[in-house]
Amino acid sequence: MKVSLPAFEKAKVLVVGDVMLDRYWVGPTGRISPEAPVPVVKINQVEDRPGGAANVALNIATLGGQVQLAGLVGEDDTAKALTLGVQALGVEPQWLNIADKPTITKLRVLSRNQQLIRLDFEESFDKQDSARLLKQSEALLDSVDVVVLSDYAKGAIDNPRDFIALARSKGVKVLVDPKGSDFSRYHGASLITPNMSEFEAVVGAVTSEADLLEKARGLLNKYQFDAILVTRSEKGMTLVTANAPELHIPTVAREVYDVTGAGDTVISALATSLAAGAELAQACAIANTAAGVVVGKLGTSTVSRIELIEALALHHGESGFGVVSEDQLAYALEQAKLRGERVVMTNGCFDILHAGHVSYLKQAKALGDRLIVAVNDDASVKRLKGEGRPVNQVDRRMAVLAGLASVDWVVPFSEDTPQRIIARLLPDLLVKGGDYKVEDIAGGAEVISAGGQVQVLGFEDGISTTAIIQNIMAKQ
């Protein structure tokens, strides 16, 4: 299945649920305590990250979605730290402060990228607190397309059935990250996303794939869910709906360092994708890819749009790693520049990739951190090179280029010159191979006007696509 990202900036999502602060104490350990057989950790780093429903909201914001966040907190310094954490990414929280309860905090002690212990500071909120939170959140339903209920069984989501019914009556999809063995509380939800242990806590042990599907469909019928997405760790995800065949999506994680917050990432990517107009199967594939990225990070983390673009290109793209649309590339460049990366760009037909091309692209990449290759599409090559060209279709040309270690992104263009796309992307450095003069290079004036540079690189003598084609024809 070809997977592309929808316009996340159009997504409007409300997250309601158990917010918490994930606090990390980090340091080296080199000895055992004389008081007890436990390691001594010398703390040299303290970090606070929004967790639970707050992490869901931050994931949505990081992807580019518009998000509102509602949750229960205490009247303490932890609540202030949590507020600052979400505001840092542009999320304005709608807290309900409960004076006699602490803001939920999970403190983790880490050494050498390993979690040694977790300490929880919490008291469950009362039912009336949850009722007030859900009532307060009703006023926000008219301004969103999707609601996420992030339930960690801490009291914020006690009995949301009326809230779900109201949201659905307004045409708002309701996604639930469930907790506990009573799924009747989520009756009528659009989609629930239990992991395998949460699923089995409700339906009992799953003995086979057929058994999983039968039990999932039983829940659909019993609680009037539109769909169930069971996340299955190394086995990927299984989507079950009432009126379509099941969909199994294999895992895409390459390395797993920490599963903290992986469920948050799944439901946030689902919500953002659906709110942006994606079909359910597409949204699930995006969420699966996002989860594969986040488990490769340590601690509660988010996934950026550029990370998702690259991971999708690697795992789902039909043209190989690095092949992106112009819009995807424009966003990727914004992120690259925010990270302080120097972006180099070149262009060409690259009809038959040869040693001269490879050497040239390697030189170009050495001049910066990222290399973009803009490729003439088939119609453009035919106009420039004549009948019989291109030898290779644009998808194949881009796939070969994307396989080179020196190339980060490959993007097609349809005009005879790349002036328009260069003027839009404005790399830090525009390079061209051959005997061009800088003032004659398409797009060069625009790059220089924007403060960038233009440079001419040499090609290896005696190697060209035309010469290769002529040599092949002479031997026939």
UniProtKB/Swiss-Prot annotation:
Keyword set, alphabetical order: ATP-binding, Carbohydrate metabolism, Kinase, Multifunctional enzyme, Nucleotide-binding, Nucleotidyltransferase, Transferase
The protein's name in its UniProt record: Bifunctional protein HldE
Entry-linked SUPFAM superfamilies: Nucleotidylyl transferase, Ribokinase-like
Any Gene Ontology CC annotation: cytosol
Region annotated Cytidylyltransferase, chain positions: 345-476
Organism: Shewanella oneidensis (strain ATCC 700550 / JCM 31522 / CIP 106686 / LMG 19005 / NCIMB 14063 / MR-1)
Protein's UniProt keywords contain DNA-binding: no
Region listing for Ribokinase, in residue ranges: 1-319
